[in-house]
Regions:
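Conserved N-terminal beta-strand and adjoining loop/helix that marks the start
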Residues: 1-19, 41-43
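Short secondary-structure boundary/capping segments
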Residues: 2, 10, 26-28, 86, ...
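Residue-level signal for short segments within beta-strands and strand-turn junctions
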Residues: 12-14, 22, 97-100
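Conserved Nudix-box catalytic region and its N-terminal flanking loop in Nudix hydrolases
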Residues: 18-58, 153-165
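Unchanged
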Residues: 42-66, 77-135, 139-140, 161-165
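Low-complexity, intrinsically disordered Gly/Pro/Thr-rich segments
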Residues: 144-153
């Protein structure tokens, strides 16, 4: 089991909505039934920008405008995991925001990750999501400059505490 993972996540904005994925398609998915932004794991040799652009294109069909793509922060998830050698799983998530893109949104049937939907910002906290997402979404909305956020979760997925630097 790889207990240290690098990922990206992008909040793609159109009008007053974010493009979200309802993770309902994969069987063994730690994001199962949650609504999350678009992104995924790094492939060998990728930079954070390479990864987020590839993941967004693969999952949505959209091409992000590089000049408007904002690298907003790094979120470190530390999750207790009894199957990990040291009892912890750590994910470094490179967080992006973008409101300028080209292309046509693919049909949700063609997205392997889940159901794509534009969600009004005002409804974001009403959907099933990770509690820590509220913290970094708030930082994005407040236009906080580049930040580092550490989120500590227990094995059941409950947020224990967090630290913003």
């Amino acid at each position: 089991m790889n207990t240290l993972v690098n990922t990206t996540l992008c909040y793609i904005q159109k009008d007053d909505c974010y493009l979200m994925i309802h993770r309902v398609k994969k069987v063994n998915d730690y994001n199962k039934d949650k609504w999350i932004g678009v992104g995924g794991k790094f492939e060998n040799g990728e930079s954070p920008f390479d990864c987020v652009k590839r993941e967004v294109l693969e999952e949505t069909g959209l091409i992000l405008n590089e000049e408007k793509l904002e690298y907003r922060g790094i979120v470190t998830f530390v999750c207790k995991n009894s199957q990990a050698p040291d009892g912890l799983f750590t994910e470094f998530m490179h967080l992006f925001w973008c409101d300028d893109f080209d292309g046509t949104l693919i049909d949700s049937d063609d997205c392997n990750e889940g159901v794509l939907e534009w969600i009004p910002k005002s409804a974001m906290n009403d959907l099933p999501h990770w509690k820590g997402d509220e913290i970094f979404l708030d930082l994005i909305e407040k236009r906080v400059p580049f930040f580092s956020l550490k989120l500590n979760y227990d094995e059941e997925g409950n947020l224990l505490n967090y630290l913003i630097n």
